[in-house]
């Protein structure tokens, strides 16, 4: 199926200060946005796609100056794809605190003329949703046909349905959770500790030193990447295969250099990530993950937290996802059903772990295609 083709981002500037959940106020900020498809006359066919930890506004298509720059969900969004841009107007927003053009730690603090660095305020999922709502306002979109996301993006979709219930017709929440478990918070803490203990971190102000805490960021990514894959998937891809420069397949080096294929893979992923991602952004986004817990204000009662939602829901999980296991999605489903909301739920049998939500799986895509067909019929798209 064809890609949407060449796309270009746009930068939106906001002068009205944004009060964050922490109490900090962010003024004169910018958000980078990409759109695909055409907004209909009734402005009823808009879909917001929320991104996960290391992704961005670049959901689909490619950039003219880099044909390898395929959007992170290009298999899902485009002409004739499950989220069909011939029928829907799709928006991707790069969240505050990111390192892909929206205001974040790498941006210049107007009060100092230097990068914010560690002084950039902690942001939350709720802060992102408020900022995204201003993007919707700028496009004149009063109500989204759907807000959709996977993983951390799914948390944003759920938050949209809570915070702006009248502005969301459908919430599509994939491979997500209503809150992080202690184990997930622990993984994030180990990853942050790797960054914070890197000598090149310099308290978060490494920009002034002309360095990046690549060693810490590399380890953080390696830790995270392990949690995105299933044990079966890793066994299938790597097993205990050895990686030897001399071509020998059955002998150990008896050293601490790379011996196994899985070690080589993790180091490659870590090095690649450390080259393009920002360490301060990693700290911010993992903390936003930790803080997300809409039931907290309701004494841990998720049913009470979701009582005022109005959207219809599609909740999807993957059988081998142990980062955000199917049981976490079922918690959301139960709370919605307790509130007599309209909910569709699917647990997809897939071997790829948490990352399955990014992959081109026929059953998964058919599910989304059918659901968007239903939405298209509702809005006349």
UniProtKB/Swiss-Prot annotation:
Active site: 151 (nucleophile), 321, 354
Gene Ontology MF term list: homoserine O-acetyltransferase activity; homoserine O-succinyltransferase activity
Name of one Pfam family that matches: Abhydrolase_1
Keywords carried by this UniProt record: Acyltransferase, Amino-acid biosynthesis, Cytoplasm, Methionine biosynthesis, Transferase
Site, Important for acyl-CoA specificity: residue positions: 323
Catalytic reaction annotation: L-homoserine + succinyl-CoA = O-succinyl-L-homoserine + CoA
Name of the top EC class for this enzyme: transferase
Ranges in a coiled coil: none
EC number of this enzyme: 2.3.1.46
Localization terms from the record: Cytoplasm
GO terms (BP aspect): homoserine metabolic process; methionine biosynthetic process
Major subcellular site: cytoplasm
A single Gene Ontology CC term: cytoplasm
SUPFAM superfamilies in alphabetical order: alpha/beta-Hydrolases
Quaternary structure, from the entry: Homodimer.
NCBIfam families the UniProt entry points to: homoserO_Ac_trn, PRK00175.1
Protein name: Homoserine O-succinyltransferase
């Amino acid at each position: 199926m064809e890609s949407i083709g060449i796309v270009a981002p746009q930068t939106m500037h906001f002068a009205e200060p944004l009060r964050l959940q922490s109490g900090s106020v962010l003024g004169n900020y910018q958000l980078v946005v990409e759109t695909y498809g055409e907004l209909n006359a009734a402005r009823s066919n808009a879909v917001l796609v929320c991104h996960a930890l290391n992704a961005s506004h670049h959901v689909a298509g490619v950039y003219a100056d880099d044909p390898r720059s395929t959007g992170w969900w290009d298999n899902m969004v485009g002409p004739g794809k499950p989220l069909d841009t011939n029928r829907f107007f799709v928006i991707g927003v790069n969240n505050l605190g990111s390192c892909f053009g929206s205001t974040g730690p790498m941006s210049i603090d107007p009060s100092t003329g230097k990068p914010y660095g560690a002084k950039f305020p902690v942001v939350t999922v709720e802060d992102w949703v408020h900022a995204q709502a201003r993007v919707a306002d700028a496009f004149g979109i009063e109500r989204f046909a759907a807000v959709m996301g996977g993983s951390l993006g799914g948390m944003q979709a759920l938050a949209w349905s809570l915070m702006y219930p009248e502005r969301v017709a459908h919430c599509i929440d994939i491979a997500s959770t209503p809150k992080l478990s202690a184990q997930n918070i622990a993984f994030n803490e180990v990853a942050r500790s790797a960054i914070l203990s890197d000598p090149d971190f310099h308290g978060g102000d490494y920009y002034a030193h002309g360095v990046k805490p690549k060693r810490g960021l590399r380890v953080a990514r390696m830790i995270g990447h392990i949690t995105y894959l299933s044990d079966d998937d890793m066994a299938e891809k790597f097993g205990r295969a050895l990686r030897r420069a001399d071509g020998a397949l059955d002998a150990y080096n008896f050293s601490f250099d790379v011996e196994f294929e899985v070690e080589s893979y993790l180091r490659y992923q870590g090095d690649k990530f450390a080259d393009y991602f920002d360490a301060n952004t990693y700290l911010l986004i993992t903390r936003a993950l930790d803080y997300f817990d809409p039931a907290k204000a309701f004494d841990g009662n998720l049913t009470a937290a979701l009582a005022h939602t109005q959207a219809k829901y599609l909740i999807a999980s993957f059988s081998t996802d142990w980062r955000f296991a199917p049981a976490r999605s079922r918690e959301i489903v139960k709370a919605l059903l307790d509130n007599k909301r309209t909910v569709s739920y699917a647990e997809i049998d897939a071997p790829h772990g948490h990352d399955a939500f990014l992959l081109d799986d026929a059953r998964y895509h058919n599910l989304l295609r059918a659901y968007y067909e239903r939405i298209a019929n509702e809005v006349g798209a």
